[in-house]
Swiss-Prot record:
Belongs to the eIF-3 subunit H family. It is found in: Cytoplasm. This is Eukaryotic translation initiation factor 3 subunit H. There is a cross-link at residue 303 (Glycyl lysine isopeptide (Lys-Gly) (interchain with G-Cter in SUMO2)). InterPro entries: eIF3h, eIF3h_C, JAMM/MPN+_dom, JAMM_MPN+_peptidase_M67A, MPN. It comes from the Eukaryota. GO terms for molecular function: metallopeptidase activity; translation initiation factor activity. Keywords: Cytoplasm, Initiation factor, Isopeptide bond, Phosphoprotein, Protein biosynthesis, Ubl conjugation. Its main location: cytoplasm.
Length: 352
């Protein structure tokens, strides 16, 4: 699966010449305000994404695909999509870039929007803040500034509420990724925190008038709403699994903090040794000067005291961002259930 994610990012760069029209004069980069203020998705695209996961997604395995559409002012309209086929690393003959180009060429022949505007991915209990997603979205957004990534959560959707969110990398993070410098000093200079990594773009799902009429008629004929228990509590398995994933990420964060603290202690110790060495040389030079002897030759301190390599902090930011996502999911889950409990209590007191 990792190879497919890496291929996703590289394919965006390879197809930038084909999809350049999607970026209407914005150019490459990520500076300034966000180029996209709203994402409009056709209902057909949502159904295709859901169908793709139901057919090929299982367990922790995620499904991915390409989003097609166009840009109208500050609104990104997603009108079609197609999936990445499931393949293993043994399929050496499979060329993902060639597959995407063939698909877009076929769509162009039948007069369907074929401009590359992003990609989508399913998630497992909200576990999508990863380095692979960051690298892929950077490749897309660097080639096509308006690109977004749609994150589809099948577990939340199965509970009765469609979970589909659009994300983009913030301009600050785009600049840091361009420099490829994830040292503590670079992230501090860019004022990058886990809250300034991804920006969520509002989503609007659009259907034709005929589809809206059909859905209205089906809703009147459906008896599902009458049988649905509005005050039934959600399964505790979701909460337990999310808490387990949260604890795993907290453990990873603790290990990363230990590594960083070790680096800081070693750096501080080295600075003290360097300062003591300079003082000893200065005292010895003063003694040699008093005896009329020449001072000691200059030495390259960087060779004597090789600076420790600072640990990259991007992984720590990603872990912190994932922890924040888990906390938001737990907050949303518990808020819904607590609301149902209070409503059930009020109804019971009213009927008694």
């Amino acid at each position: 699966m990792a190879s497919r994610k890496e291929g996703t990012g590289s394919s965006a760069t390879s197809s930038s010449s084909t999809t350049g029209a999607a970026g209407k004069g914005k150019g490459k980069g990520g500076s300034g305000d966000s180029a996209v203020k709203q994402v409009q998705i056709d209902g057909l695209v949502v159904l295709k994404i859901i169908k793709h996961y139901q057919e090929e997604g299982q367990g922790t395995e995620v499904v991915q695909g390409v989003l097609l559409g166009l840009v109208v002012e500050d609104r990104l309209e997603i009108t079609n999509c197609f999936p990445f086929p499931q393949h293993t690393e043994d399929d050496a003959d499979f060329d993902e870039v060639q597959y995407q180009m063939e698909m877009m060429r076929s769509l162009r022949h039948v007069n369907i929007d074929h401009l590359h505007v992003g990609w989508y991915q399913s998630t497992y209990y909200g576990s999508f803040v990863t380095r692979a997603l960051l690298d892929s979205q950077f490749s897309y957004q660097h080639a096509i500034e308006e690109s977004v990534v749609l994150i589809y959560d099948p577990i939340k959707t199965a509970q009765g509420s469609l979970s589909l969110k659009a994300y983009r990398l913030t301009p600050k993070l785009m600049e840091v990724c361009k420099e490829k410098d994830f040292s503590p000093e670079a992230l501090k200079k860019g004022n990058i925190t886990f809250e300034h990594m991804f920006e969520e773009v509002p989503i609007v799902i659009k259907n034709s008038h005929l589809i809206n009429v059909l859905m209205w008629e089906l809703e009147k004929k459906s008896a599902v709403a009458d049988k649905h228990e509005l005050l039934s509590l959600a399964s505790s398995n979701h909460l337990g699994k999310t808490l387990q994933l949260l604890m795993d990420r907290v453990d990873e964060m603790s290990q990363d903090i230990v590594k960083y603290n070790t680096y800081m202690r070693n750096t501080s110790k080295q600075q003290q040794q360097k300062h003591q060495y300079q003082q000893r040389r200065q005292q010895e030079n003063m003694q040699r000067q008093s005896r009329g002897e020449p001072p000691l030759p200059e030495e390259d301190l960087s060779k004597l005291f090789k600076p420790h390599q600072p640990p990259a902090r991007m992984d720590s930011l990603l872990i912190a961002g994932q922890i924040n996502t888990y906390c938001q999911n737990i907050k949303e889950f518990t808020a819904q259930n607590l609301g149902k409990l209070f409503m059930a209590q009020a109804l019971q007191e009213y009927n008694s």
